[in-house]
Amino acid sequence: MTENIKDALSYAVELAGKENKIICSKTGKEYFDGNEYSLQELNPRKYTPILELQTIKSLVDYLKSDNDLISNRKLIVVVNSFQEISVYDQVDFENGKRPQLVSVRASVPVIPFSNWRDQEEFNIMLQSMFIDDADRNLVLDFASHLKIEKGTEVQDNGISQMATVRDGVASLAQAKTPNPVTLRPYRTFNEVEQPASQFIFRINKSASLALFEADGGKWKLEAVENIARYL
């Protein structure tokens, strides 16, 4: 019993030594001293929630509207990537922060590059996720007429492939895959021009088809430039 009382007294003394205190800074801010090593501001400045948008037009409309009385503030618009834009307020030097006001993220389809798709899925992907232009139609035409049956081989020299395609109503013919092809998928904001880039078009023995990106990501820089030019 005596040892328990002694332990309780020791704990009480320890708590007294770490008594919570309110500390006032030179700027008048009050901080809570929880453990002598970490100060927590009692009434920190509250920032408005980040406004989330999906189009560049909505961002431009917001900035022009002056709904939040921002016309006289020095804002910074940052094109983070081909799918994201951020707007920051001027620096809050007192709190050491640059508050973010707006976040804009493009709503674009997820295109399964480098993944094998059957002919139907591949054709749907081309028609729904790519801009209608010459090379898209060339690939679409080839994919639509592709025919691989038992005993048929896809000839491949590492650059192009030869496959059997329907030629007319009943006859079949050998045709070379179009490669490389220049396509414009929907990958950035709809308000700006979709960058064109090169792709490798491939077929496997099961007649599945795939597109592989072949421009090293150069299109991303072009997309960022297009967004900045629009703004």
Segments and roles (model prediction):
Residues 3, 50-54, 113-117, 121, ...:
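Alpha-helix boundary/N-cap detector
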Residues 6, 57-60, 120-127, 140, ...:
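Generic detector of well-ordered alpha-helical segments enriched in charged/polar residues
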Residues 13-17, 64-67, 130, 134, ...:
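Generic secondary-structure transition motif, activating predominantly at the C-termini of alpha-helices
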Residues 111-162:
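Membrane-inserting effector segments that mediate pore formation, membrane fusion
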